[in-house]
From Swiss-Prot:
Region entry Disordered, spans: 1-23, 226-248
Organism: Mycolicibacterium paratuberculosis (strain ATCC BAA-968 / K-10)
Family matches, as Pfam families: GidB
Name used for this protein in its record: Ribosomal RNA small subunit methyltransferase G
Gene Ontology terms, MF aspect: rRNA (guanine-N7-)-methyltransferase activity
Length: 248
């Protein structure tokens, strides 16, 4: 059970090293009501947990609190535009639950698995899922591990946010997808440059129709930038070698 503390500026005591101030968690924007509908209260509770326990446990920087809605929750939920009804998705390197938890709240029809290699983060995710009452599975593991691939292969979509460069991310994502399933990686403003840099490796890993799309243009400034790639064929054995998964 999470206990929400007041989130506000913290002044260091005399003689203490300077600490970065904790920003204020703002109210949910109007667009959140449209995205989350009757589950807005669940999204608000998640925002509170991120702004308190998420900061205390080092999963979110203290200066990110006032940007939780736009930069983190809505940015993640916007990917729902690219998902079909009832899609089975896996969130690779879920960290604090982004983008998987906002997607699960906005789209209860989705089957969501949160994959996270670090114990403290997977424990946090389990607590959050229980607190919010979500039908979401939390798994501690890495995308490149054989047991993970055997159990969670054939997904409709593999989503991620700020996990790794596209060469590694594609190698981890493609084996978890069904034929024509899609990797949806939330990236920054240089996504197109990254695609150009790694396109050859992505193709060798079984990716096709690689493109950069935007989501949430009606309510996000800037909108979410997503690299979309379809699994066209099984990845070449050499391109799926085991490596260390990225962390946030």
């Amino acid at each position: 059970m999470f206990h929400v503390k007041h989130v506000g500026p913290v002044e260091p005591a005399a003689g203490d090293p300077e600490v970065p101030p904790v920003a204020e968690l703002g109210a949910a924007p109007e667009s959140a009501a449209a995205l989350f509908g009757p589950r807005l209260a669940t999204a608000q509770r998640y925002a509170e947990v991120l702004g308190t326990a998420g900061v205390e446990r080092g999963l979110l920087g203290p200066r990110e609190v006032d940007r939780i809605w736009d930069r983190h929750i809505l940015n993640s939920a916007a990917v729902a535009e690219l998902l079909g009804r009832g899609d089975r998705i896996i969130d690779i390197g879920s960290g604090a639950g982004l983008p998987g938890i906002p997607l699960a709240i906005a789209r209860p029809d989705l089957e969501v698995v949160l994959l996270e290699p670090l114990l403290r983060r997977s424990e946090f995710l389990t607590e959050v899922v229980d607190e919010l009452g979500l039908a979401v599975e939390v798994v501690r593991g890495r995308a490149e591990e054989r047991p993970v691939r055997d159990r969670f292969g054939e997904r409709d979509a593999a989503v991620s946010r700020a996990v790794a460069a596209l060469d590694k991310l594609t190698k981890w994502s493609m084996p978890l997808l069904r034929h024509d399933g899609r990797m949806l990686a939330i990236k920054g403003e240089r996504a197109a440059e990254e695609v150009d840099r790694y396109r050859r490796v992505m193709t060798a890993s079984g990716a096709a129709d690689v493109r950069v799309v935007t989501c949430g243009a009606n309510y996000l400034r800037p909108p979410a930038t997503v690299v979309s790639a379809r699994r066209a064929k099984p990845p070449h054995p050499k391109s799926a070698r085991t490596g260390k998964a990225g962390t946030r």
